Amino acid sequence: MNDEASTPIQEDLKEESAVDLAQEAKPTSDEPSLSNVAEGSQEAGAETDVTSSDAKDSSSQALDNEARLEQLEREHETLNSQYMRIAADFDNFRKRQSRDQDDLRLQLQCNTLSSILPVVDNFDRARQQLNPEGEEAQALHKSYQGLYKQLVDVLKQLGVAPMRVVGQTFDPSLHEAVLREPSDELAEDIIVEELQRGYHLNGRVLRHALVKVSMGPGPKDDGEETITEQSLEGDNTTDQQSSEKSD
């Protein structure tokens, strides 16, 4: 009877012991399991790999950016050099174009004025030759002189100025020698006479002056040399006779 009564109690004790043993065998939440440790190690390794990969990517990106920057700087220097060269060429072209336009304008002006100068020459010759007599002729001559003066004033306003050449030394850049003659009064290459007036246009030669130039003193004639020699011989003979008489 005692054996049958104790059997349920023993079974309960056995069950409680089994439960306790199971609880003791079960790991607590505070103690990490081997699997958790392994998983953590794997995650840490993965994070380390990611960090290392990011660092490599950042370093590679920095090198690429630096290389790209150097390339852009070289391209900038090349383009800037090309721009400066093009700007200099354009400035030279602009200056050359302006100079060519000025030269063309001056050439057209010279051609126009050169065609007017013969008219001025005719006015000047007529003014010097006319000697009017009577009131009507003098009135006509006065009107003619006024017209000539008006023409000269217009030329002066355009920058035309006459040359003054008589008594000056001959200069082939200004004068054109048409005649040459000996002169006892003037040295060689001195302008004796103006045959056609020359003109300047704003400091440049518009038309050369046609002139007569001195050749300087000419050679002595043979007759004059003979007379001079004879007179010298006569003087010497007279001196000798005078000295003999005195002796």
Swiss-Prot record:
Please describe the quaternary structure of this protein.
Homodimer.
Q: Please give the GO cellular component terms listed in this UniProt entry.
A: cytoplasm
Q: What is this protein called?
A: Protein GrpE
Q: What HAMAP family does UniProt report for this protein, alphabetically?
A: GrpE
Q: Which residues cross the membrane?
A: none
- Origin superkingdom: Bacteria
Species of origin? Prochlorococcus marinus (strain MIT 9211)
Mind listing the UniProt keywords for this protein, alphabetically?
Chaperone, Cytoplasm, Stress response
In Gene Ontology terms, what is one molecular function of this protein?
protein-folding chaperone binding
Q: Which family does it belong to?
A: Belongs to the GrpE family.
Chief place of localization: cytoplasm
This protein's record includes keyword Cytoplasm: yes
Q: Which Pfam families does the UniProt entry name for this protein?
A: GrpE (PF01025)
**Which gene codes for it?**
grpE
Residue ranges, compositional bias (Polar residues): 30-39, 49-63, 228-241
